[in-house]
């Protein structure tokens, strides 16, 4: 089940990531639905878009709680949550829900930046810290990033 988290309260330099879910949906109309590699067509799958969450832009924790609650509902219903962001921080809400259902959850992270800071400009809940927060939740405390394996102690 697809849902959007239009949030960008901790982005650096410029806002706009909150428009990501709408932009992804808009551009998806031009996608080819058939994959010759998978010999499958997206139209053969039941995919439901439940729309965007209404998130509080003044509180990262409140926004994350809403994202987590929605992911929990989807997981409890036996479905797979597919989150459209938004800035990187939205990932934390979904990971919080997923680790409750899958305690042995592992994370593979592809990005130009590690997002492993303990805090950024005094904030522990930031796009620049999100992977540190996620990996504090998972076991083992190691994960793969682009071109490197990191170990969090």
Protein language model annotation of sequence segments:
Residues 1-153:
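Conserved alpha-helical scaffold segments that buttress catalytic/binding sites
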